[in-house]
């Protein structure tokens, strides 16, 4: 099974990530890769100038395409577009200590499903008010849920390609209509919780996918130091 991480210094965005140094985040990624069970084929998708950080601890390095930052999840969708078949993409602050149990009879799986907060729901309303429904119709479907993308599992190339197509169209709409007017990226406000995490559920509702959750099957097999837990880890560790 291929287990993939995505890293670029250019994607250290957001208030919480900006508190942590580049060096600390790089060490988190290195620890995540080293600690992951050896049964996985370990792959890093990264910039050419950071290959040396990972080349000795992975089985394969894929050089990142030099695309402009739009959403925090861009790197994951970029590498998912390059790889076919069955694979997992993992966050760099997610420590896998045992082989993961995969959901069965699914087309794809993610870490867990949750309910969007008012900020994220507000972002969706902005998309709708600016007319995304005519360009990317899946956004018209009523929905307040999202999928956390800390873990992403794919095994259906056809559905994966359809999901990525919707993601690309959402990116294009955002850069054409949203960023010039609202300047979320310029002001370091992360739209990705809507445009990528909520997008997955919008896609699911329109394509009748079979989506599984890692969280409910793997409670003791990984720890995700996401959000503020990443900052707590800085205080507790000498990584």
Positions of PLM-derived features:
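N-terminal anchoring/stem segment of glycosyltransferases
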Residues: 1-66, 226-239
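Short His-Asn-centered micro-motif
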Residues: 5-7, 44-48, 90-92, 110-113, ...
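A conserved donor-nucleotide-binding helix/loop in the catalytic core
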Residues: 23-34, 64-90, 97, 199, ...
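Short, polar loop motifs at secondary-structure junctions
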Residues: 45-52, 92-99, 217
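Active-site regions of enzymes building and remodeling cell-envelope glycoconjugates
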Residues: 54-68, 86-88, 103-110, 223
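GT-A fold catalytic core of metal-dependent nucleotide-sugar glycosyltransferases
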Residues: 77-119
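Short beta-strand-to-loop element that shapes/binds the nucleotide-sugar donor at the catalytic cleft/hinge
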Residues: 108-141
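Catalytic core and acceptor-binding pocket of nucleotide-sugar-dependent glycosyltransferases
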Residues: 139-236
């Amino acid at each position: 099974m291929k287990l993939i991480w995505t890293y670029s210094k250019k994607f250290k965005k957001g208030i919480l990530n900006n508190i942590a140094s580049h060096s600390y985040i790089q060490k988190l990624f290195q620890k995540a890769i080293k600690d992951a069970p050896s049964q996985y084929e370990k792959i890093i998708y990264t910039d050419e100038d950071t290959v040396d950080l990972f080349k000795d601890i992975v089985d394969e390095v894929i050089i990142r395409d030099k695309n402009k930052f739009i959403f925090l999840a861009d790197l994951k969708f970029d590498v998912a577009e390059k790889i076919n078949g069955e694979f997992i993409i993992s966050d760099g602050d997610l420590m896998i200590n045992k082989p993961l149990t995969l959901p069965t009879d699914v087309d794809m799986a993610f870490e867990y499903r949750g309910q969007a907060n008012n900020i994220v729901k507000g972002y969706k309303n902005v998309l709708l008010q600016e007319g995304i429904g005519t360009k990317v119709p899946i956004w018209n479907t009523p929905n307040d849920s999202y999928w956390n993308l800390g873990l992403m599992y794919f095994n259906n190339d056809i559905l994966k390609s359809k999901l990525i197509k919707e993601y690309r169209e959402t990116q294009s709409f955002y850069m054409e209509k949203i960023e010039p007017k609202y300047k979320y990226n310029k002001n370091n406000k992360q739209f990705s919780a809507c445009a990528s995490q909520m997008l997955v559920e919008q896609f699911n509702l329109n394509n009748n996918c079979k989506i599984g959750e890692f969280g409910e099957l793997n409670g003791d097999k990984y720890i995700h130091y996401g959000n503020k837990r990443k900052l707590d880890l800085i205080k507790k560790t000498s990584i």
